[in-house]
Design a protein with these regions (language model features):
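Central regulatory/effector-binding core of bacterial HTH transcription factors
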Residues: 55-117, 184
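Secondary-structure junction motif
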Residues: 140, 154-174, 238-246, 256-257
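Beta-alpha-beta core module
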Residues: 118-124, 128-129, 188-235
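Hydrophobic hinge/microswitch elements
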Residues: 93-98, 103-107, 162-216
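A short LG(V/I)-centered, amphipathic sequence patch enriched
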Residues: 5-24
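A late-sequence structural motif
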Residues: 70, 216-259
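Flexible hinge/capping segments at coil-to-helix
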Residues: 52, 119-130, 134-156, 240
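Alpha-helical linker/hinge and terminal dimerization helices associated
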Residues: 7-8, 29-51
Length: 259
């Protein structure tokens, strides 16, 4: 009480041999103090409820191949275990956009390519091998691995700059440059263009898995990978619902990421 009186600069209690009584100032501020105490109690109850009840809203950032191949199955199976947790899902055009959303707090967690540029706290989930995709009637459709010389000579459909780091690094390691004829943002667009015979491409396996259009998938001349992870801004500051989701994703991908 003495500390509170010093902080407020007013006398709240009158002290005498008979005990203590509220001063006029004390009576004036008492209702406000009671409201503050009630609000604090309500807040603590809510927090404890969130700890005990698996509820809340998790905001997730993702990119197209994870959205298509993993996320629907993850959310479906997670929802059976934690039916009270809700989700908001946003899809980023580029990995750095997703990282920016995590840093700013726009989302609670996000799927991204590792290593993180913005030094987020991350968990590695899956090594995604790059694959050559060609039209089904391509002369080299049955060549596995695909010839290096053909990768340099054939018309190439390139993923838009910003998501193509591993692909360009693979060409650098092979010592060749692709014969780029088209640049596209969406992996599904590239799959359709390859299927129509407009060229070949080099994409991560998760992008070409279960292609909606007919294509032929071949191994690259060498093994190249991108590492997919899930990232958060601060592991220690996660809500209970976000922590449950991140832990669930790590287990799910270990068991199901290749299917």
């Amino acid at each position: 009480i003495n500390s509170l009186e010093n902080e407020l600069g007013v006398k709240l209690l009158s002290r005498n041999r008979g005990g203590v009584v509220l001063t006029a100032d004390g009576r004036a501020v008492l209702p406000k103090i009671e409201k503050l105490c009630a609000a604090h109690h309500s807040l603590m109850q809510t927090v404890e409820g969130l700890k005990d009840m698996d509820s809340g809203v998790v905001k997730i950032a993702t990119f197209s191949s994870v959205s298509a191949q993993w996320l629907p199955r993850i959310l479906k199976s997670f929802g059976k275990v934690y039916p009270n947790i809700e989700f908001e899902v946003v899809t980023g055009d580029f990995y750095d956009q997703i990282e920016g959303w995590i840093v700013s707090g726009t989302v609670d967690c996000g799927f991204l390519r590792l290593p993180s540029v913005k030094r987020l706290q991350t968990y590695a989930l899956h090594r995604d091998e790059l694959q050559v995709i060609v039209p089904c009637d391509h002369p080299y459709a049955d060549r596995d691995p695909f010839p290096v010389s053909a990768l340099a000579e054939e018309p190439f459909i390139q993923l838009e700059e910003g998501d193509d780091y591993e692909i360009m690094a693979a060409f650098d390691e092979m010592g060749i440059r692709p014969n780029v004829k088209y640049i596209a943002r969406e992996d599904r667009t590239i799959l359709a263009m390859v299927s129509e015979g407009l060229g070949i491409s080099l994409l991560p396996e998760l992008m070409v898995r279960h292609s909606p259009t007919p294509i032929k998938v071949c191994h690259a001349p060498l093994h190249f990978y991108r590492t997919i992870g899930i990232g958060v801004k601060d592991k220690k500051a996660l809500s209970n619902s976000t922590r449950l989701f991140v832990d669930y994703v790590r287990t799910w991908v270990t068991e199901n990421g290749n299917t």
